[in-house]
């Protein structure tokens, strides 16, 4: 083996090693800056103000659509509001919370009152008649179908929040609004009940975030 060939092999080995080290350092740096799911959750804050820059909300919407729900029924609708004038009207019936108007996109999670209609729609779409007696049996024994549907909206909200954190998009889950006024302003039909909101958008340069606090696992988790 001549000298030139040996040098070529040595250079190739060194290059491969550098690429591997570089990849490791890149992963380490990105994980330390929010590259992992858990780090991104720790990064997340419920912001009170939003900036003017445009963010890509498609990942959030995809997460909401793909969030789990009981039987896969998704007994809710999500109203997506980007129109400024509409957001101003909604702010006036949301105790003047600034996020409503300042956010780029406001997601309004609405429970569906008539669950039976949703079940029929689900069976028609999935062609899975075997699920009908199971779902019907559950709903017939459900003490409060509307409350149950409302619970499902919070699951979808959680996945939307997680997706926003994953993309480091600023967000704020919200209650504190007059649901009947939302129905009126948005022209919703009587089968929809606004339950909870998710405001998303870009960072406000004037944002002042308070230190984050979470109870520790010894307090929050009860292990048996």
Region spans (language model):
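Acidic, surface-exposed loops and disordered segments
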Residues: 2-224
């Amino acid at each position: 083996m001549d000298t030139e060939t040996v040098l070529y092999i040595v250079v190739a080995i060194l290059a491969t090693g550098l690429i591997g080290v570089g990849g490791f350092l890149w992963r380490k740096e990105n994980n330390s800056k929010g590259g992992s799911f858990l780090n991104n959750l720790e990064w997340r804050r419920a912001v009170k103000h939003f900036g003017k820059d445009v963010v890509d909300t498609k990942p959030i919407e995809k997460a909401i659509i793909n969030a789990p729900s009981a039987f896969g029924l998704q007994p809710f609708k999500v109203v997506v509001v980007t129109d400024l004038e509409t957001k101003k009207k909604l702010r006036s019936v949301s105790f003047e919370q600034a996020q409503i108007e300042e956010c780029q996109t406001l997601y309004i999670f609405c429970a569906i009152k008539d669950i039976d209609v949703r079940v029929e729609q689900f069976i028609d779409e999935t062609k899975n008649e075997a699920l009908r007696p199971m779902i019907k049996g559950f709903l017939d024994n459900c003490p409060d179908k509307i409350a149950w549907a409302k619970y499902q909206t919070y699951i979808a909200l959680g996945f939307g929040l997680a997706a926003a954190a994953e993309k480091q998009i600023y967000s704020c889950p919200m209650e504190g609004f007059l649901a009947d006024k939302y129905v009126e302003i948005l022209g919703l039909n009587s089968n929809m009940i606004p339950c909870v909101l998710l405001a998303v958008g870009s960072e406000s340069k004037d944002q002042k975030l308070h230190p984050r606090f979470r109870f520790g696992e010894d307090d929050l988790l009860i292990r048996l």
